[in-house]
């Protein structure tokens, strides 16, 4: 059997730190939901298929407002996630054949590119495991208990 690469895009999170009624992955960024940028990057990569993981009760919403509206061909299945991220990953892994390579991506992270995806695929095939990280570009401030900036690393 041909080795396939499956991407799991996690979109079941609540984004509670955002203090918004709209989950991060569904917020609008330049007139499109944030999650569409990640899905488009996987669509434009050599990934064979995508499994989208959404919160309970959101399957119909994701199908209509994301998949149908933007016509993603590689999203083969929508899976309902769990209470925690690891539950959602587990639910997706349960529907993927063992011989597949698996990439896991947070759907609220819009700035993944097909080039980064290809790099991950190369590395996971070579080393059997890969974690992608990119340098922080924003200024980071360390604050004290009263939220006063105390230093910039």
Where do the PLM segments sit?
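Residue-level signal for inorganic ion chemistry
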Residues: 9, 35, 92, 105-106, ...
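Structural beta-sheet core signal
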Residues: 7-9, 52, 104, 129-132
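Conserved donor nucleotide-binding strand/loop of the catalytic core
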Residues: 68-83
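Glycine-rich phosphate-binding loop at the start of an alpha helix
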Residues: 36, 82, 86-90, 114
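N-terminal glycine-rich phosphate-binding loop and ensuing alpha1 helix
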Residues: 2-59
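Active-site nucleotide-sugar/metal-binding loop of Leloir-type enzymes
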Residues: 87-101
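Acidic helix N-cap motif at the loop->helix transition within catalytic regions
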Residues: 60-66
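Conserved core of the sugar-phosphate nucleotidyltransferase
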Residues: 112-153
